[in-house]
Amino acid sequence: MARKRNSYKSINDIQRMRGNRWYYHYYQYLCSLAYQLFEWERLPPSVDPSYLEKSIHQFGYVGFYKDPRIGYIACQGALSGTVDHYNLPDRFHASSVGYQNTFKLYNYSDMKEKNMGVAIYNNDLKCSTLPALEMFAQDLAELKEIIAVNQNAQKTPVLIAANDNNQLSLKNIYNQYEGNAPVIFVHESLDLDNLKVFKTDAPYVVDKLNAQKNAVWNEVMTYLGIKNANLEKKERMVTSEVDSNDEQIESSGNIYLKARQEACNKISELYGLNLKVKFRYDIVEQMRLNAQGIENVSRGTLGGETNG
């Protein structure tokens, strides 16, 4: 007869599962923010803007091509061919699901040929956004775990040493203590001299941990080019500090916007589409405010102030 599998989960297993959930929560949320940072205007109907942005953030670039058979297409793939004196590849090998092709890349206006395409880069380094978001999600999840541990430590600040003979009596005494009994009566046989009580006195540092988590959150918002100055007591910042923070955020956002605008210019020159791309401030700002509101409720604050 097969032995029954032990379904008991250790505290380490439970904590690991909880940490994984927090990691995926933050990772998916940050990815969702990144995927809708930019709004594309005048894209051909056959090009899905959601697929376009996901591919750019995931792989660092995507191909844009007008196929003679199916029309305009955004395609995943690999940069190929030879690299010129400006370190730009001259070909793109498309390898999307259901589409395989290799086409020359349009890099310079004075070197235009038929059946060329354009590579849309995520940034000047042509690298993905996701590794950084994974790192930030891990930091946020770890801090969330530590906060949960510190909160849980506040629930059992007293340890009472007991044995099989006096455990029930001590539980009854503690229940009276918890019930704010003015007088606690015990049996005369109870050995009070050997009664050992240990106070764990776990320090409450949730507020400090939340401040650190907000600092990490602000860092990732700056990384994505999203305003974040008012998440932590913006009224304490002088105008020069706010302006400096806004300049840093704008510079971070331009890392991604610049590469997309350059691709728009090339596509417009090559195909005459007059594409435009811009930062989607309204939706991103609403998502950020929603996240801020959820965090304020979770730590018992409104408008950044602690409720007394």
Swiss-Prot record:
GO molecular function: RNA binding
Record keyword Iron present: no
Pfam families the UniProt entry points to: Phage_connector
Stated name of the protein: Portal protein
GO term, biological process aspect, one: symbiont genome ejection through host cell envelope, short tail mechanism
Assembly: Homododecamer.
Gene name of this polypeptide: 10
Places the protein is found: Virion
GO CC annotation terms, alphabetical: viral capsid
InterPro entries named in the record: Gp10, Gp10_sf
Chain's role: Forms the portal vertex of the capsid. This portal plays critical roles in head assembly, genome packaging, neck/tail attachment, and genome ejection. The portal protein multimerizes as a single ring-shaped homododecamer arranged around a central channel. Binds to the packaging RNA (pRNA) and ATPase gp16 motor.
Gene3D superfamilies listed in its UniProt record: 1.10.246.30, Bacteriophage PHI-29 conector. Domain 3, Upper collar protein gp10 (connector protein)
Domain of life: Viruses
Main location: virion
